[in-house]
Curated annotation (Swiss-Prot):
Record HAMAP family: MurB
Entry keyword set: Cell cycle, Cell division, Cell shape, Cell wall biogenesis/degradation, Cytoplasm, FAD, Flavoprotein, NADP, Oxidoreductase, Peptidoglycan synthesis
Gene for this chain: murB
Protein name (Swiss-Prot/TrEMBL): UDP-N-acetylenolpyruvoylglucosamine reductase
Sequence segments annotated as region (Disordered): 212-232
Catalytic EC class: oxidoreductase
Molecular function (Gene Ontology), one example: FAD binding
Species annotation: Leptospira interrogans serogroup Icterohaemorrhagiae serovar Lai (strain 56601)
Entry function: Cell wall formation.
CC annotations in GO: cytosol
Extent of Basic and acidic residues compositional bias: 212-229
Major localization listed first in the record, in broad terms: cytoplasm
Record-linked Pfam families: FAD_binding_4, MurB_C
Enzymatic reactions: UDP-N-acetyl-alpha-D-muramate + NADP(+) = UDP-N-acetyl-3-O-(1-carboxyvinyl)-alpha-D-glucosamine + NADPH + H(+)
Length: 318
């Protein structure tokens, strides 16, 4: 575990941010920025609004030897109870916008909220992105994990990704990026910052699009814990198949292992959908981590299958 940032280090760092007119906030409880509603107080959140500010803040991080992590919508994330040994970077301003470029092409900022953004784009009469209207979080995070459901993935639609890597700007086509099921190369490159994407959609029938939006919304609502604080599916489906060719789902393995409804502290493996862990109101990151380890061990004991996490950890979680 890294040491807590010193007061003098933070003071000089914040003074430089003020001089550079880069927006920031101090002493922010990160739990309020996550769908899990779990996470302790971070000393500083820096919120750059334009690309030049992102480049500048990376230089400032390096100058003051400040460890940092980037936070998006916080929907597929378990945040540390003590995120006090790093600074959080969270895009704002123009990164929250999307614009039509014409002929079904859209430029979408990394800090746009996926659910309303892709619903609005679909309701303009373009089809292919309806499934993304059911996925919470921000577009940047959806890119990093190649978010998908109902047979669709974000990279099916992407024309290009704009990102910073080691302070240098890149625009890459999907063919130039490693990606797969709930995976992209950005997952393993913590020095990369997604700034935005361009996608290409086809024109469609608005009535059929509205019907598709409703169908996917209803399916999502019926298959997930209702009005519960969670981070979505905890484990990836293992890509293991039965003799009849049907894929074995992660939730089935949890259920067969008798894990449905298990509780640790304020966290519970959902009785409604056991590939979800829910915050009953007082859960800590440690509570959730305990249940994750329990699932991995128990499922391996009962099935011989090793499950991999879909949610990401943010900070040190014992």
């Amino acid at each position: 575990m890294s040491p807590v940032l010193s007061e003098s280090q933070l003071r000089d760092f914040k003074h430089t941010l003020e001089s550079s007119k880069i927006p920031f906030r101090s002493e922010v409880r990160l739990g309020i920025l996550s769908s899990f509603k779990i996470g302790g107080v971070c000393p500083v959140i820096v919120e750059p609004e334009i690309s030049s500010q992102v480049s500048e803040i990376l230089h400032i991080f390096s100058k003051f030897d400040i460890p940092w992590k980037i936070l998006g919508g916080g929907s597929n994330l378990l945040i540390s109870d003590h995120p006090d040994n790093f600074v959080t970077l969270r895009l704002s301003g123009k990164f929250k916008e999307f614009v039509s470029l014409g002929d079904g092409k859209f430029k979408i900022g990394a800090a746009t909220n996926t659910t309303p953004t892709f619903r609005q784009i679909s309701q303009l009469g373009y089809t292919g992105a309806e499934f993304l209207s059911t996925i919470p979080g921000w577009t940047g995070g959806a890119v990093i994990q190649n978010a998908g459901c109902y047979g669709g993935e974000l990279f099916d639609l992407i024309e290009s990704v704009e990102f910073l890597r080691n302070g240098e700007m890149f625009v890459r086509k999907p063919s130039e990026i490693k990606y797969g099921y709930r995976f992209t190369e950005f997952l393993n490159q913590k020095d990369s910052i997604i700034l935005g994407i361009e996608i290409l959609l086809k024109e469609g029938n608005l009535e059929e699009i509205e019907s598709s939006l409703k169908d996917k919304r209803d399916r999502r609502n019926s298959s997930q814990p209702e009005n519960k604080k969670s981070a979505g599916s905890v484990f990836k489906n293992p890509k293991v198949f039965r003799e009849d060719g049907k894929e074995i789902k992660a939730w089935e393995l949890l259920d067969q292992a008798g894990l449905r409804g298990q509780i640790k502290g304020g966290a519970q493996i959902s009785p409604e959908h056991c590939n979800f862990i829910v915050n009953l109101g007082t859960a800590t990151a440690s509570d959730v981590h305990y249940l994750i380890d329990l699932v991995v061990d128990r499922v391996y004991q009962t099935s011989g299958i090793l499950l991999n996490r879909e949610i990401e950890f943010f900070g040190d979680i014992p």
